[in-house]
Amino acid sequence: MATTTGAKRGIWPMIRRIAASDRISGLIMLGFALAGLVLANLPLTAHAFEAVAETHVFIPHTNLDLPIGHWAQDGLLTIFFLTVGLELKQELTTGSLANPKAAAVPMLCAVGGMITPPILFLATTALFSQFGPGEPGSLILATTGSSIPFAEMSHGWAVPTATDIAFSLAVLALFAKALPGSIRAFLMTLATVDDLLAIILIAVFFSSVNAWYWFIGIAVCAVVWAHLVRLKKVPWIAVGVVGILAWIMMFEAGIHPTLAGVLVGLLTPARVMHGEYSPRAERYADKLKPFSALLALPIFALFATGVHFESMSPLLLLSPLVIALIVALVVGKPLGIIVTAWLATHVGGLKMAKGLRVRDMIPAAVACGIGFTVSFLIASLAYTNQELSAEARFGVLVASLIAAAISGVLLSRQSKRFEQAAAVAAAEADAESDVNTHSDELAEHSITLADGTESVEIDFRR
């Protein structure tokens, strides 16, 4: 019995350590994303994978009758958004966003990084619609050869706006061991604001409001949640019920239900209360991290990329939609971030963290082109045409891998330069310390000799 108990005690801390590692959890999600693409297109597994993804699960007395693939997107992903909401609340209260002046540059960069990709996406697709192989004003899908009007393809303008914070930090952890913490803090702040803006995009552009009375229920759930999580002893069963009710009411109201997680997360206290050792928002986010990073995100990625292509070939890389997403994420994201940073510091008079220059942010800005989670979600919401949705998710996957590879190379080189600079600075500091020590010894020797007392002590130090 003791052995079993010890094993259980050892397994959960290990799971939490894995979930806390941006590098490992990011690689796990990438593995599931690639597995979904393979399983959906291998002849031996495609039928079984589709059967599982399309199996419907319903909740009685509601309109909730969704296939498992949609439950992963609308249900499990709520855990991720709850974690995001809790982290946002903590950052807004005591973290990097608590002081707007200090966070001004990365906050503005997040806005710039969300404006530029849609512009490049629309410009690229517009060029293909005018000068591509199809009729003017339309584009050709690589998988089926069918013609899609530019107006319909332009619905995906929001797909390349989001940054996947988990993958971006995973790339930093893999390739940037010697970088100063200010670069990671900059990326964290930028990605946090990016998440907030992406949530607003989903709420405004990809929700269709139904009956207004559901909003009364959502408001009641919000008030009850805010009260319950402030009690000295939190009634977890009641909290869980309120959270589920808020999710159902969001769904019934026509708002994307994952936003229920953000709502209740933002209502959770982010300051220490009742004599506790840490804020509740921080603790709850820490406890939810394993479920978010190792359950919700991998399963979502599995089904999000698990789209079947009739003709899986390298021609997919020549799809106008895929190329537009690559340009938007790999070029547009870093371009928007760097240009905004330059304007903010050189024109706006704002300052970056001490020791950081705008060009130091280029590798991290390229890492912001890694889309994945929220981009997959927006691709599913933006296109009702399944062929377009499939190509969009494939484009996000390819663009994210390219951005990760480029940023990995740039971060590795930058890390070596910082490491060399740190070594030179350390050597100079040691040399200066030796000189100062030698000077002190000589001064002590001369002062002792100049002492007129009978007892003279001379200390010769080598």
UniProtKB/Swiss-Prot annotation:
It holds the Pfam family Na_H_antiport_1. Keywords: Antiport, Cell membrane, Ion transport, Membrane, Sodium, Sodium transport, Transmembrane, Transmembrane helix, Transport. Coiled coil: none annotated. It is a multi-pass membrane protein. One of its GO terms (cellular component) is plasma membrane. It is found in: Cell membrane. The chain crosses the membrane at residues 24-44, 66-86, 102-122, 156-176, 196-216, 235-255, 256-275, 290-310, 312-332, 361-381, 392-412. It comes from the Bacteria. One of its GO terms (biological process) is regulation of pH. The keyword Transmembrane applies. One of its GO terms (molecular function) is sodium:proton antiporter activity. It catalyses: Na(+)(in) + 2 H(+)(out) = Na(+)(out) + 2 H(+)(in). The keyword Transport applies. Na(+)/H(+) antiporter that extrudes sodium in exchange for external protons. Belongs to the NhaA Na(+)/H(+) (TC 2.A.33) antiporter family. This is Na(+)/H(+) antiporter NhaA.
